[in-house]
């Protein structure tokens, strides 16, 4: 529970590395330059993206150059600028930190919660946003499979109808944001990276979430969700839930229009101006493809695992 038509695609994973390197080179992407400094710093190997809290600061580079040695990411940087990182929670420590955050934020709202499994499941990926190794946000992506989705427990009729229409379903669950941080940038970045996993990399086209009825309007207004199922009791968290659905094509259109344009936030009252720009998204997708193991995607056909990648 949650509190543009491009060039030809590369469906062969063996060709993707060459394809993606050309794409990244075209965007001049190699390093994440710290704001207000001429110095740049490499991302750590398990970091998907490092993001300034200030939404007006542009991202200069997103991809780790594997040939460079590790170094202090704050060396030579303006330490008055805050940076958070988004990682896939692959270690027991990262997953424990995410579980603690989920439990703390859910308990504050009177929800039940269960800890994340010790290891990443083949059909689920948990992302963690952290500042100085402190978890400040987390979200879990669930991919449809013969085992089904969590939303099937309450909304089997609705999900069955979508599958019958040929929709490729995924779900976002276990969203938790540290109430002290209260950053639209962190929330938008987590959602955008989760979208990249589900849509750009995996080829899923429909996102399902279960939310408290009080939060329905927020997700409709801020991300473009529509109500798909009535209010029912979610026994996993012991709270009422409404099923919402987002067509990823709508999200893609909004990202193309508003992504990377925080100056539109007052006019376009949604989260999309706080998303990454289209070139930044392409670079992050490239990093995901190069750093995440194929085993995560082994339950899908090759054509779906690599859907959405551009190759010139």
Each language-model region and where it sits:
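Extreme N-terminal leader/anchor segments
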Residues: 2-56
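A conserved beta-strand-loop-helix scaffold within acyl/acetyltransferase catalytic domains
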Residues: 78-167, 177-179, 200-201, 222, ...
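Generic structural signal for individual residues within well-ordered alpha-helical segments
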Residues: 96-99, 217, 252
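Conserved N-terminal entry element of GNAT/NAT acetyltransferase domains
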Residues: 42-92
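Hydrophobic transmembrane alpha-helix bundles
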Residues: 15-19, 26-39, 146-159, 207-211, ...
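Short charge-dense sequence patches
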Residues: 35, 39-57, 137-150, 165-173, ...
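Charge-rich, low-complexity intrinsically disordered segments
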Residues: 239-311
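Acyl-donor binding region in acyl/amide transferases
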Residues: 152-250
């Amino acid at each position: 529970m949650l509190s543009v038509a491009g060039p030809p695609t590369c469906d062969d994973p063996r060709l993707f590395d060459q394809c993606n390197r050309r794409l990244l080179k075209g965007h001049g992407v190699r390093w994440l330059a710290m704001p207000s400094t001429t110095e740049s710093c490499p991302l750590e190997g398990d970091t998907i993206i490092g993001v300034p809290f200030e939404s007006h600061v542009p991202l200069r580079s997103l991809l780790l150059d594997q040939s460079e040695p590790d170094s202090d990411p704050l060396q030579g940087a303006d330490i008055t600028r805050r940076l958070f990182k988004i990682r896939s929670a692959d270690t027991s420590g990262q997953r424990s930190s995410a579980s603690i955050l989920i439990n703390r934020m859910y308990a504050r709202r009177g929800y039940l919660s269960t800890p994340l499994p010790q290891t990443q499941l083949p059909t689920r990926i948990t992302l963690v946003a952290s500042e100085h190794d402190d978890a400040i946000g987390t979200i879990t992506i669930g991919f449809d499979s013969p085992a089904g989705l969590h939303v099937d427990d309450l909304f089997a009729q609705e999900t069955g109808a979508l599958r019958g229409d040929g929709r490729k379903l995924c779900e976002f669950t276990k969203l938790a944001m540290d109430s002290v941080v209260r950053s639209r940038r962190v929330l938008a970045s987590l959602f955008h990276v989760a979208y990249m996993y589900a849509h750009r990399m995996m080829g899923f086209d429909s996102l399902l979430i279960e939310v408290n009825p009080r939060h329905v309007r927020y997700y409709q207004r801020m991300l473009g969700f529509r109500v798909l199922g009535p209010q029912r009791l979610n026994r996993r968290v012991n709270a009422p839930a409404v099923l919402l659905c987002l067509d990823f094509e709508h999200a893609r259109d909004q990202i193309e229009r508003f992504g990377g344009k925080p100056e539109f936030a007052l006019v376009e009252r949604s989260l999309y101006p706080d998303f990454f720009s289209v070139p930044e998204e392409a670079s992050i997708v490239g990093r995901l493809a190069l750093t995440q193991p194929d085993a995560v995607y082994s339950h899908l056909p090759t054509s779906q695992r690599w859907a959405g990648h551009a190759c010139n």
